[in-house]
Amino acid sequence: MGEKKPEPLDFVKDFQEYLTQQTHHVNMISGSVSGDKEAEALQGAGTDGDQNGLDHPSVEVSLDENSGMLVDGFERTFDGKLKCRYCNYASKGTARLIEHIRIHTGEKPHRCHLCPFASAYERHLEAHMRSHTGEKPYKCELCSFRCSDRSNLSHHRRRKHKMVPIKGTRSSLSSKKMWGVLQKKTSNLGYSRRALINLSPPSMVVQKPDYLNDFTHEIPNIQTDSYESMAKTTPTGGLPRDPQELMVDNPLNQLSTLAGQLSSLPPENQNPASPDVVPCPDEKPFMIQQPSTQAVVSAVSASIPQSSSPTSPEPRPSHSQRNYSPVAGPSSEPSAHTSTPSIGNSQPSTPAPALPVQDPQLLHHCQHCDMYFFADNILYTIHMGCHGYENPFQCNICGCKCKNKYDFACHFARGQHNQH
């Protein structure tokens, strides 16, 4: 009977040696050096405890309750993580916990052999070595910017591209994909034209243009319910209820719907004697009544005064023209001072009779296509939204680069917008 009492103690000792071997094997794989020393010290302490016969009941309790001291010298929490002895930090791996403890001890074993730099984390040393080698593995997907640290890339996205992380309910469409599509759709909009999407941090707000309020009383039966639904946000700005709704109701789709509604309206005939307006049936919402090459030339020649005809005076800017500049580009001037251009040599200028100030043929002019047939500001804005900002003959819908204004007009007449 006296020989059977030491059996539970021998079982605990054998199990403790087994845990010591397994921990030593894990520390060898992870490259931890301090873990071996602590394991040997704890093994020696466990051997002394076996000789005294005092620590065995506590070991049995720690095995049953999943808490207490392990062979590597760290306390384990109830969820199985290793707890820091200095604070409440807990980690599943020994190597990560040892790196955390170096914050408390101030140890920096990872040193650069080219300069006095030292760090407690190996990944920080790897990022530092890129400053000596010149390696830049992180590249921005929106521009040619490259950097050696991931944090610098995140700072570049926030500062340069106004990209901020979207915090809210998770949806089927990832935030990165949504931002990428929005940046591709709106990156070519000019600064002189009012953008429909405000990409400034901290929120992304889809705004309703102010000029719709000025022109809706002139054009009947215009449905702006889509803009009203997109403009229902807080005064300080807020995110839409669902990113999927933002992708469906993006500004290009809204312009396409608006163009389809405008095409069904009868044309306004403010100046019956002016042959500038070329009626053209369109089958697609985004064709925007693009005329042929001869029609464009005839429209330009009809709007240019002859040598015997007087030139038109400069119109005064209206309320909507002061707040909105329809001519885009770095060399553009305000629309209030935009007069009818002349081709070739200078035409003789003589006093002319006063024309109506609100004549749309004088207020809306595309300098890239040399077209004057825009009846109102809405059609002009839709047309200018089709031009790219950096390259005016690049399609803002599909990114297709055209050679000149005739190729650009034919591209929209065909209506083949294949996303690249």
From Swiss-Prot:
Coiled-coil intervals, chain numbering: none
Organism of derivation: Pongo abelii
Low complexity composition-biased segments: 290-311
Gene field: IKZF5
Protein name according to UniProt: Zinc finger protein Pegasus
Disulfide bonds: none
Subunit structure: Self-associates. Interacts with other family members; IKZF1, IKZF2, IKZF3 and IKZF4.
Cross-link annotation Glycyl lysine isopeptide (Lys-Gly) (interchain with G-Cter in SUMO2), location: K5, K185
Chief location of this protein within or outside the cell: nucleus
SMART domains on file: ZnF_C2H2 (SM00355)
